[in-house]
Amino acid sequence: MLIDPLTVVAQIINFLILVALLRRFLYTPITQVMKKRERLIAQQLQDAAHQQEVAQQEAERWRQMQQSLEHRQASFLTQAQDAADEHRHQLLQQIRDEVDSTQAQWREAVKREQHVFLSALQQRAGQQLAATLRCILQDLASANLEQQILETFITRLSHLPFSEQGVLETSLSNARGEELVISSTFPMPEDRKAQILAVLHQYAPAMESSVYQFVTIPDLICGIELKIPGYKLAWTIEQYLEQLEVKLNQVWDGMEKSWVEQG
């Protein structure tokens, strides 16, 4: 088979023309469309990536906001709990203080009532005991007891301490012109009066016996008393009763103090 060169050349030219036409009207538009599509897809992918990044950033922002909110909520809860605990502590302390104050006031009131009661009881008991003893001694008073009282008084008057003798002598010397009273619970026999005057004469020889006045005072309760301005000498059971009453008061004071401390 013979190959016509012209035909071959014509075919080649036709092929090249076809290729050029295909490239111009088919391949190039398709390529452009494909590139445009690729660019569009790339842009869409880029936009999607950007949107995803924005979404992630927004999600991160919301997560941080949620964490901050949770942290603030926890902080608020902690502060509220601390405030509630502090308020509860203050209320409890206030209640304790009020209870302590009430108890202290109650104890003080009880102590005052105890003091008033014990003082009244002390006074009444001492007075009653002294009054009872006075009645007993008055009932038991007899001539022998009176003589013994006079003997005791005369002995004491005759044997005064040296310092007291000086006081008596000075008082007698300064009492010139005044009545000097010698009191007794019972009427004094004349011989006993003479004995007393004799002893007093030793202390004041210049003193007249007439200045001495003997009187009877039942309230002395079994006793005798010499009273001069600036000096007094007495022996009475009343003195011992007063001492007893003082001792009783001291005992009561000690008991009261002990009860108050225990209360």
Curated annotation (Swiss-Prot):
The protein's matches in InterPro entries, at most eight in alphabetical order, are given as:
Alt_ATP_synth_F0_bsu, ATP_synth_b/b'su_bac/chlpt, ATP_synthase_B_chain
- UniProt subcellular location: Cellular thylakoid membrane
Q: How does it sit in the membrane?
A: Single-pass membrane protein
- Say yes or no: keyword Acetylation present: no
Main subcellular location of this protein, as a coarse class: membrane
Q: Which UniProt keywords apply?
A: ATP synthesis, CF(0), Hydrogen ion transport, Ion transport, Membrane, Plasmid, Thylakoid, Transmembrane, Transmembrane helix, Transport
Gene Ontology cellular-component terms for this entry are: plasma membrane-derived thylakoid membrane; proton-transporting ATP synthase complex
What the entry lists under Pfam families is as follows: ATP-synt_B (PF00430)
The terms under GO molecular function for this entry are:
proton-transporting ATP synthase activity, rotational mechanism; proton-transporting ATPase activity, rotational mechanism
Membrane-spanning segments: 2-22
What PANTHER family does the record tag this protein with? ATP SYNTHASE SUBUNIT B', CHLOROPLASTIC (PTHR33445:SF2)
Q: How does it assemble?
A: F-type ATPases have 2 components, F(1) - the catalytic core - and F(0) - the membrane proton channel. F(1) has five subunits: alpha(3), beta(3), gamma(1), delta(1), epsilon(1). F(0) has four main subunits: a(1), b(1), b'(1) and c(10-14). The alpha and beta chains form an alternating ring which encloses part of the gamma chain. F(1) is attached to F(0) by a central stalk formed by the gamma and epsilon chains, while a peripheral stalk is formed by the delta, b and b' chains.
What family name appears in the similarity comment?
A: Belongs to the ATPase B chain family.
According to its UniProt entry, what is the function of this protein?
F(1)F(0) ATP synthase produces ATP from ADP in the presence of a proton or sodium gradient. F-type ATPases consist of two structural domains, F(1) containing the extramembraneous catalytic core and F(0) containing the membrane proton channel, linked together by a central stalk and a peripheral stalk. During catalysis, ATP synthesis in the catalytic domain of F(1) is coupled via a rotary mechanism of the central stalk subunits to proton translocation. Component of the F(0) channel, it forms part of the peripheral stalk, linking F(1) to F(0).
Q: What name does the UniProt record give this protein?
A: ATP synthase subunit b 2
Question: What organism does the record attribute this protein to?
Answer: Acaryochloris marina (strain MBIC 11017)
Gene name, Swiss-Prot/TrEMBL: atpF3
